[in-house]
């Protein structure tokens, strides 16, 4: 997993995590499950670390449903699914840990419509958005995220 994050961060640094480079399609999707490429003609396997870490390029904008996962691509805005160690729950409690944009984060506040997280150990925020909310391994909604004054704001979408 550490190697995977290093490769991903390196990729972000070299491409700027944007759609400006000619060889970078609309979105980079990282999934924790195998995607049947034959079902999605616009999915191109970028690299595969193991059975749990796979990166895909999507050559068109749009949202794609695959089992419990929702994968979105919109001009460099990415959806991500996470490993089983830290995942969003249906209602993350203040003080609990979640995985956000591939990094461990602590929930610092929670309300009916949003919750805020702070990254642990000063790890960098990679700018990913459209994160899945999972409860016991099942995706129950999407979280859209943005940054205000250095804090990551997460809006719940059920």
Give short role names for the model-derived ranges:
Residues 32-36, 58-62, 81-87, 118-125:
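Secondary-structure transition/turn motif
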Residues 17-62, 134, 138-140, 144-158:
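Catalytic histidine site
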Residues 46-48, 67-73, 107:
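Short amphipathic beta-strand and strand-loop transition segments with alternating hydrophobic
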